Amino acid sequence: MGDSKLDLLQGTLDLMVLQTLAAMGSLHGYGIARRIEQVSGDEVLLNQGTIYAALVRLQQRGWISAEWGTSDNNRKAKFYSITKRGRKQLTEDAAYWQRLASVMDRMLAMPEEESKP
């Protein structure tokens, strides 16, 4: 994890996608990926394979739905929306990550032991 860009921990991409759809409404895969990149300040960069694998997984779990539509550039695209089950999962996952972040903040704030002579 020493790269300049962030490596995603298991489950974080799902949470990012669910939050993006909850905040922005229906979006196509490219739009979801770009929004995550923008909000992260380009710390998280997503390739097509990564985002579409996550979208398939979330759809299989019933957390998002998809329907075909037309994008801003008049191309056929699949648009994704968060479902009721997805909103419930988002609430649970967000609470978990907030607890974890709080624990990590406390751990990182712990003073280092001074070396003993």
Can you say where each PLM-predicted feature lies in the sequence?
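Basic amphipathic alpha-helical segments that dock to polyanions
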Residues: 51-58
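Glycine-centered, phosphate/nucleic-acid-interacting loop/turn motifs that mediate DNA/RNA or nucleotide
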Residues: 62
